[in-house]
Amino acid sequence: MEDRFIAATDREPEVTLHFSKRYISLKGEAYPEDAAAFWGPIINALKNYLTLDAQAGLTLDIELLYFNSSSAKALMNILNALDEAAQQGGDFCINWYCQEEDETMQEFGEEFSESLQYAIFKIETLAI
C-alpha cells in the first residue's frame, strides 16, 4: 500500500495514511464541501489495506476540533471497518484526542467508542 499525506485546508483535516508503519492520523477540522469526494478515497485506501493485511493491525489517531454530520458518518465508516478487522484478530487501536475543556468532542468520542466491540478505543484529553 502506498502511504499518503493530505495537507489540511480551512475545511479539511490533515490526513496521514502511513500504512507501512500501520498508522493513520486525522487532525484539524472536517467539514469538506464534498464529503464523499474527500472521505471516499481515504475509506477506500483503508479498506484496501485491510483486505491485504488486516491481521497486522493499525493505530488511528483522531484529533479533530470540529466535524460536520457528513464527516461523522465517514468517521463511523472508518471506525466500523477497523472494528470488523479487529474482530478477525488484528490489533487495532483508536486514540481520540480532544481538548480538556471541549465537552462536545469528548462526548462524540464516547458515542463512537460505544459502537465498537473489538477495536481498542481510548479518549485522551489535551491541556490547552
Indicate residue ranges for each PLM-predicted region.
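Short, aliphatic-rich beta-strand segments
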Residues: 22-28
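N-terminal amphipathic/basic leader segments beginning at the initiator methionine
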Residues: 1-17
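Secondary-structure boundary motif
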Residues: 48-55, 84-88, 114
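A short, well-ordered alpha-helical element
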Residues: 12-15, 31-56, 75
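A cross-taxonomic marker for long C-terminal extensions/tails that follow the last structured domain
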Residues: 6, 111-128
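Helix-adjacent hinge/juxtasegments
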Residues: 49-59, 65, 70
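Amphipathic alpha-helical interaction surfaces in cytosolic regulatory modules
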Residues: 37, 42, 62-112
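Residues at or immediately flanking beta-strands
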Residues: 57-61, 91-93, 120-122
